[in-house]
């Protein structure tokens, strides 16, 4: 027998159970079912910005958490959700029950569900629920250190055009100083990207508290005249290898953004290279990144630097009229 609890607040015991479930799913599938953003909501609370749906089953050891879903709620946008079911409790209809629960709580804005890794079971579940493929996020990778199967990438030097170098300087992010200006530029750079562009000061500060945060790998290009941030490249290091290695740390192009006023200046490419050189100098063997498959300029840039497609995450959805 199963029971689904819907809440926006998790107890310490529920937090521990969800994190353990997420780890079990990642170990079984080789890919995380819950994103970094969702895990931050688990640890710090949704605080009115989302809902948790927890699926419990009665087992010999008592009631246990067998699955969970989280729906991120943003004004004017469809709910953005993820679903995870414990490996030992699959094929019991829990995934479909969680999807139905998500849909029951979605309003007129609709529902979007992310399937990380584009695995066959997720495709089948989406089809059974009448969900359509709407978007894909590519995961690309680049070898920074040569291996038997992949030679090390050759990285050009991150040189600004002379006229751009006269106007901007590239330095590292200053915690406690740059937050508000970075949020301004991030919102402008990602005005058409709701997940990234809507980041708040609280979201940023939560990431600053994460073990992986390192301001020495967070590069900002600052307008010498106005002091405004013209662009940035935030890098990240995954100590667990992120599925690319057997536990050896790898790097990530976490996010690159350029203010619309500076687009076309070559600043994005230079900032990307600055971060890649930083990650290579740390001795990391690989670097990965995520990019929307429809973002052709970004895909072209990353391919020109030697990145190749590795995996993809797929967004499925439907609108309320399709119930």
Curated annotation (Swiss-Prot):
Chain positions recorded as 1D-myo-inositol 2-(L-cysteinylamino)-2-deoxy-alpha-D-glucopyranoside binding sites: 36, 195, 236, 252, 290
UniProt EC number: 2.3.1.189
A Pfam family of this chain: Acetyltransf_1
PROSITE patterns reported in the protein's UniProt record: GNAT
Domain of life, per lineage: Bacteria
Record key words, sorted: Acyltransferase, Repeat, Transferase
Catalytic activity: 1D-myo-inositol 2-(L-cysteinylamino)-2-deoxy-alpha-D-glucopyranoside + acetyl-CoA = mycothiol + CoA + H(+)
Biological processes per GO annotation: mycothiol biosynthetic process
PANTHER family documented for this protein: ACETYLTRANSFERASE (PTHR43877:SF1), AMINOALKYLPHOSPHONATE N-ACETYLTRANSFERASE-RELATED-RELATED (PTHR43877)
Quaternary structure note: Monomer.
Protein name as catalogued: Mycothiol acetyltransferase
Annotated organism of origin: Thermobifida fusca (strain YX)
Gene: mshD
């Amino acid at each position: 027998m199963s029971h689904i609890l819907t809440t926006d607040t998790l107890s310490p015991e529920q937090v521990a159970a969800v994190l353990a479930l997420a780890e079990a799913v990642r170990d079984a599938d080789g890919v995380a079912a819950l994103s970094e953003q969702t895990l931050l909501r688990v640890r710090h609370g949704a605080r009115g910005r989302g809902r948790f749906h927890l699926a419990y089953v009665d087992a010999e050891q008592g009631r246990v958490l067998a699955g969970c879903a989280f729906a991120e709620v943003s004004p004017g946008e469809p709910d953005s959700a993820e679903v995870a079911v414990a490996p030992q409790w699959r094929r019991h209809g829990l995934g479909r029950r969680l999807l139905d629960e998500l849909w029951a709580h979605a309003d007129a804005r609709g529902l979007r569900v992310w399937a990380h890794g584009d695995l066959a079971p997720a495709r089948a579940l989406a089809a059974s629920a009448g969900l359509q493929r709407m978007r894909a996020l590519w995961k690309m990778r680049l070898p920074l250190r040569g291996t038997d199967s992949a030679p090390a990438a050759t990285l050009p030097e991150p040189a600004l055009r002379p006229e751009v170098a006269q106007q901007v300087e590239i330095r590292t992010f200053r915690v406690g100083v740059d937050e508000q200006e970075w949020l301004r530029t991030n919102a402008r750079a990602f005005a058409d990207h709701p997940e990234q562009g809507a980041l708040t000061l609280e979201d940023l500060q939560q990431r600053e508290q994460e073990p992986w945060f390192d301001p020495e790998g967070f590069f900002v290009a600052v307008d010498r005249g106005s002091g405004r941030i013209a662009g940035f490249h935030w890098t990240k290091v995954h100590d667990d290898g992120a599925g690319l290695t057997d536990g050896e740390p790898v790097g990530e192009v976490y996010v690159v953004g350029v203010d619309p006023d500076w687009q076309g200046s070559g600043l994005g490419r230079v900032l990307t290279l600055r971060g890649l050189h930083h990650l290579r100098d740390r001795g990391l063997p690989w670097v990965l990144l995520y990019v929307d498959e429809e973002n052709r300029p970004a895909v072209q840039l990353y391919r020109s630097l030697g990145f190749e497609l590795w995996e993809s995450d797929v967004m499925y959805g439907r609108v309320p009229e399709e119930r």
